[in-house]
Regions:
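Short cationic amphipathic helices and targeting signals
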Residues: 10-14, 44-52, 106-110, 251-267
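Glycine-rich N-terminal segment of FAD-binding domains in flavoprotein oxidoreductases
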Residues: 28-102, 106-112, 120-124
Length: 298
């Protein structure tokens, strides 16, 4: 009897592909919706996750690491290098909690799927006039056009991150008067390396330009007085390529007055971008920004 006929008669199922197994396990672990998008021609399989809870993304990251799947923020603004392999896009739209925090200073804690219309309605004027359906995660990932050294104008006070290795960490004010410690060994290694990079020749060349031309805002480590260093500003404009944003603490900020322009980038900006990417995501868990401005969107 032929092996295929024997398997049919005995009720054996054909062996699943790793991608099918990945999707099956993802659907079992996550409360949100998982959708197979099929094959991207010449690149690889694609799927979409709409998480119902923060833990869904943590489960997805772990499975992506196990199966070699890149995890991307859905509708993030690139340009991105092509992902030659499996890709899971995550739509944070269901993670849309927004709460004003107690205290005399107006502050809000927002999940990544909060639409900008809701933030503007709450009184956060830095979102006035922006696309109301854009999510906070997409806004944070988009090119950040605040003037050099003035990332504090964004109103971002702190970000809760899921890092490439699965560590969850909060980045925020960083100085002698700030009492929130860096809890994880991952970030305790990351932050000194970023400060060293900020003091090097690549960052100096970017600071010598009329405006900060690099996509990643390493100038956040040398803010314009009276602002002080806030590590949360490192993810402004990150494109979803450095970490997954679980939540953001916001104050009232200002709309950027600069315009993001690829033409303003000095030649050292690409090398600086690659160094920062390697520090945050040495495993390639997230997409990579394209070296050229005419790269693809995912």
């Amino acid at each position: 009897m032929q092996p295929s006929r024997r398997a049919f008669l005995l009720g054996r199922r054909p062996v699943q592909t790793p991608w099918a197994t990945f999707l099956q396990r993802l659907a079992l672990l996550c409360q949100g919706a998982v959708r197979d998008l099929g094959e991207a021609p010449g690149l690889g399989p694609r799927a979409m996750l709409a998480p119902q809870r923060e833990a869904d993304v943590a489960h997805a990251r772990a499975l992506c690491a196990e199966y070699g799947v890149v995890l991307a923020l859905d509708e993030a603004q690139g340009p991105f290098a092509p992902v030659n392999g499996p890709l899971l896009s995550v739509d944070p739209g269901r993670l849309a909690g927004l709460a004003r925090l107690a205290g005399p200073t107006p502050r809000w804690r927002a999940q990544p799927g909060v639409p900008l219309a809701a933030l503007a309605q709450a009184g956060l004027r830095q979102f006035d006039g922006l696309p109301g359906s854009m999510t906070l995660a997409q806004w944070l990932a988009a090119p950040a056009a605040w003037p050099m050294g003035r990332c504090a104008d964004s109103g971002v006070l702190a970000v809760d991150l899921l890092l490439a290795d699965g560590v969850e960490e909060t980045l925020g004010p960083f100085g002698t008067d700030d009492v929130q410690p860096l809890r994880s060994a991952t970030v305790q290694r990351l932050v000194p390396a970023l400060f060293q990079l900020a003091a090097g020749e690549l960052a100096s060349a970017c600071r010598a330009a009329p405006r900060w031309g690099a996509r990643y805002r390493l100038d956040a480590l040398a803010p314009e007085a009276p602002a002080t260093v806030n590590l949360a500003h490192l993810v402004l404009g990150h494109g979803g390529t450095l970490a997954w944003v679980q939540g953001v603490t916001l104050a009232i900020g200002a709309a950027p007055t600069d315009s993001a322009s690829a033409d303003a980038a000095p030649p050292q900006a690409a090398a600086l971008r690659a160094r920062i990417k390697a520090l945050f995501d040495p495993y390639g868990r997230f997409p990579e920004l394209a070296a050229r401005p005419d790269g693809d969107n995912l």
